[in-house]
Amino acid sequence: MGDSIKVLSENRQARFQYEILETYECGLVLLGTEVKSIRAGKVNLRDGFARIRNGEAWLMNVHISPHESTNPSYNHDPLRDRKLLLHKQEIRKLVGKVEQKGLTLVPLKLYLKNGRVKVSLGLARGKKLHDKRQDLKQRQDKREMERAMKQR
């Protein structure tokens, strides 16, 4: 029996803005209305990041839209901080890397794995402007090469 994975949201902008060094799979502590909205695909990871406070990992600035068919008084705050579920050793390892090397934790994708919502967290270093330009140029050159090969 393999793991059934369904990607619900992907942060493509993160791969452009950051150089991803390592990835971690984390669970999330969510409310019921948040799970319903996530399953409906109403989530935006673009501005999200993770922080470690008091030995706990927190996902911040990720927008999960309120569920439509739920009474507004029972709905959740779209931008609330959400706790990430990681092992203590992983958190300790991340603290050292984030504080000493000046790296950032960025959510890369949100997915369902065996019915549970997981987030793929990337340990990332910010790219400089010339690195971004170089990536764009390489992508454009690759596209042109493929186009030329197709015309033959």
UniProtKB/Swiss-Prot annotation:
Ranges where the record places region Disordered = 130-152
The record's disulfide annotation reads none
Keyword Glycoprotein present in the record's keywords: the answer is no
Which BP terms in the Gene Ontology apply to this protein? trans-translation
| InterPro entries cross-referenced by the UniProt entry | SmpB, SsrA-bd_prot, SsrA-bd_prot_CS
GO molecular function annotation: RNA binding
- Please tell me where this protein is predominantly located: cytoplasm
User: Which PANTHER family does the entry link to?
Assistant: SSRA-BINDING PROTEIN, TMRNA-BINDING COMPONENT OF TRANS-TRANSLATION TAGGING COMPLEX
Q: Check the record and name the NCBIfam families matching this protein.
A: PRK05422.1 (NF003843), smpB (TIGR00086)
In its UniProt entry, what is this protein called? Answer: SsrA-binding protein
Encoding gene (name): smpB
